[in-house]
A protein has these predicted regions:
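Hydrophobic ligand-binding cavity/cleft-lining segments
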Residues: 1-47
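Glycine-rich portal/gate segments that line the openings of hydrophobic small-molecule binding cavities
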Residues: 28, 38-88
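Beta-strand/loop substructures that line and gate deep hydrophobic ligand-binding cavities in soluble
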Residues: 81-134
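Mid/C-terminal beta-alpha module of Rossmann-like enzyme folds, strongest
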Residues: 158, 385-432
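NAD(P)H-binding glycine-rich loop region in Rossmannoid oxidoreductase-like domains
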Residues: 208-261
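Conserved Rossmann-fold NAD(P)-dependent oxidoreductase catalytic core, especially the SDR/UDP-sugar
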Residues: 252, 264-306
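Catalytic helix-loop patch of NAD(P)-dependent Rossmann-fold dehydrogenases
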Residues: 257, 293-331
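Glycine/proline-rich active-site loop of Rossmann-fold NAD(P)-dependent oxidoreductases
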Residues: 325-327, 338-347, 382-392
Length: 471
């Protein structure tokens, strides 16, 4: 039976390293994007999930092919070890042992051992599996090291209110916050809610994650228990209709309404519950700047022209009303978010993998991008870093012309064909959208991030893609 082993030492006490693995969403946090695994169901049998909990995972192996994994935790020894054993799944057997070894007072080694077997004995298949696990564990340990270095810094049992938690950004942000020791109050969008429902406890450990159905279009403002309201100190507003799709009048109205109205509703929620925020953070967009050919743009530039610029400008004005109940307010002007789970990469992944890649127009317009992992780290850092206030450009410091941007992606996916698509064809579908999103020319500088020495997880597009398709 093949055996995989991986060891890594961390400069942290053994109790801190072990306890990090107890966080409810640790698995979501450390699972590499390219493994395409999501948690379907947890069955916590005790307050310590690692002791005897069961979990069902779904792995997207290829288009339209999803593999189910059913695993249980066993052989738990507090502060020393635990195991995951596959009950059923795509391989014949799978047992993962996690061992924690105290090397000194402030140094701990994690030793992972996985014994597995496939239904068919093929050396190349075993080799492929071993290589894949090597990549995955290198990524896992980078995440663990980062989170341990930030863990429990000024959290004090504070709650973070998150709206839009099920979206692309929120679904990665919540596991990060959970792993760092924050408690989380998720406002779950529900247009049928009366806003009179009570809080639902998602975590069985000391109400670490709670959820509340929220209808921002209702006149009734939801109320939360005073003991939770007093602990709410941060807010992350990620609500808003997806801007992709044909820009009909009704679609554009929904884009505007979903942003302005939900932001007003959030403010009413905060004020009604007498919440005193330390920091409020809102998703904004680089669309604020409009299209500015060959001009470097930073947070000091004025809004541009066009539908997105106008909408974003109005949106930020609504966001700034939070200064009445928050010590700091941040408009996070987010660029093109790179993730295999959604957004641009998910849209183009299939044709690029099939060997057909390209770009629209002459390819000279700049694309301002950011890796999802960097974006969620920036959000968390903004909770406490007083240097971040007002507009903050959440983009990589290395924007690329679209022809270069898509060429790098094509090379990662080994695309054999790389073409230029005349803008005439997509313009036939939605010219305004094409001009404002696909062909918009902005060269945006993350001035505040650079000035305050934010260290990018992925400084270059090549590095970002390594963390999407596999390092």
């Amino acid at each position: 039976m093949p055996e995989f082993s991986f060891s890594k030492s961390f400069n942290f006490p053994i109790n801190q390293v072990f306890d990090w693995h107890k966080s409810d969403l640790a698995l979501e946090r450390i699972t590499p994007p390219w493994d395409n695994i999501k948690v379907v169901k947890r069955e916590p049998l005790t307050t310590n999930f690692l002791k005897d909990g069961k979990i069902i995972l779904e792995q997207n192996f290829m288009p339209l092919v999803n593999l189910k994994w059913r695993l249980s935790h066993q052989n738990y020894v507090e502060g020393k070890s635990f195991e995951d054993k596959m009950i059923s799944g795509p391989v014949k057997s799978w047992v993962h042992n996690h061992e924690f070894i105290q090397e000194s007072k402030n140094k701990t080694k994690i030793r992972d051992k996985i014994n597995f077997s496939h239904w068919i004995k093929i050396k190349k298949l075993d080799g492929f599996t071993l290589n894949s696990m090597e990549k995955s564990f290198r990524y896992r340990n980078k995440i663990i090291e980062h989170d341990l270095s930030k863990q429990y810094a000024n959290t004090n049992g504070y709650y973070v209110v998150v709206s839009g938690a099920s979206g692309l950004v929120g679904s990665d942000l919540v596991p990060l916050l959970n792993s760092l020791g924050y408690k989380i109050l998720i406002l779950k969008f529900d247009e049928n809610s009366t806003n009179l429902e009570t809080i639902q406890v998602k975590s069985i450990k000391n109400k670490e994650i709670v959820s509340l159905n929220w209808n921002p279009y209702s006149k009734v403002i939801p109320r939360i228990p005073k003991e939770i309201a007093e602990k709410v100190k941060f807010l992350v507003n990620l609500s808003g209709e997806n801007i992709l799709g044909v820009w009909t009048k009704s679609k554009k109205d929904l884009i505007v309404k979903s942003r302005l109205h939900t932001t007003r509703s959030l403010l009413s929620f905060i004020k009604t519950n007498s919440i005193e925020l330390k920091t409020s953070i809102h998703a904004s967009a680089t669309g604020f700047y409009g299209s500015n050919k060959d001009m470097k743009l930073d947070e000091n530039n004025s809004p541009g022209i066009g539908f997105l610029a106008k909408t974003t400008n109005e949106w930020e004005k609504e966001q700034n009303n939070f200064l009445s109940c928050s010590k700091r307010n941040i408009n996070l002007r987010i660029g093109t978010v790179l993730s295999s789970k959604g957004g641009l990469i998910k849209l183009i992944k299939a044709p690029f993998r099939l060997g057909l890649a390209g770009y629209v127009g002459n390819g000279n317009n700049y694309i301002n991008w950011i890796l999802l992992e960097d974006l969620i780290r920036i959000i968390e850092r903004s909770f406490h870093d007083k240097a971040f206030s007002g507009p903050v450009n959440a983009v990589s410091p290395t924007p690329l012309k679209s022809k270069d941007f898509f060429r790098v992606i094509a090379e990662k996916y080994n695309s054999k064909i790389f073409i230029s698509i005349p803008a005439f064809f997509p313009n036939l579908i939605s010219k305004e959208l094409v001009q404002e999103i696909i062909l918009s020319n902005q060269k945006i500088i993350p001035k505040k991030l650079l000035r305050n020495e934010y260290k990018f997880f992925a400084h270059t597009l090549d590095k970002a893609l390594d963390n999407i398709v596999g390092i």
